Amino acid sequence: MRFISIFLIIVALCVSSSWAFNFTDQPNSFRISGTGCGSGTTTVYFSTDGRCNSACGGSIRIKGEGNNVPNQQFTLNDYSKNVTNCSGTSNVASFRCPALVNTTSPTFTVNVGNSAYHVTCQYAQVTETPAGNSADKVAVGIAIIFGALISLLAL
């Protein structure tokens, strides 16, 4: 009986730590791609300092607007070295999200200059940790872990 109790406590520890700290998260990166210069929604959008093709030679700013997105701006300087074609017909880039952005959201339509792109990236909520987990979720997970450890010592 004691062995079963210890086994169940260890299982609870593993499950709660995985749930609290989300060990199975994918890397916080994404890809954007598109063709030509089109249009799209601006709930979350990328903008450049000039026309559509200026992204090839410069940096990109990611800026969030709307009710659910903080009005903050980040500069992603590594975009230009990942562009495969600067003619505006087939620009593809991959880069890491800023610290306050995670990849758990649905795909948004965004603009890079005047080009329409899709990206799987969103701003994290204020209460989220850099890993994208809420502070409450992490606190509850830690409490479960400590409770299980105390139970192990009591056996």
Swiss-Prot record:
GO CC term (a single one): cell surface
Membrane topology annotation: Lipid-anchor; GPI-anchor
Subcellular location field: Cell membrane
Residue stretch(es) of the prosequence: 134-155
List of glycosylated residues: 22, 82, 85, 102, 105
Keywords for the protein's UniProt record, in alphabetical order: Cell membrane, Glycoprotein, GPI-anchor, Lipoprotein, Membrane, Signal
Major localization class: membrane
Residues where lipid is bound covalently (GPI-like-anchor amidated asparagine): 133
Leader sequence residues: 1-20
Modification note: The GPI-like-anchor contains a phosphoceramide group, rather than a phosphatidyl group.
Annotated protein name in UniProt: Prespore-specific protein E
Source organism of the structure: Dictyostelium discoideum
Primary gene name: pspE
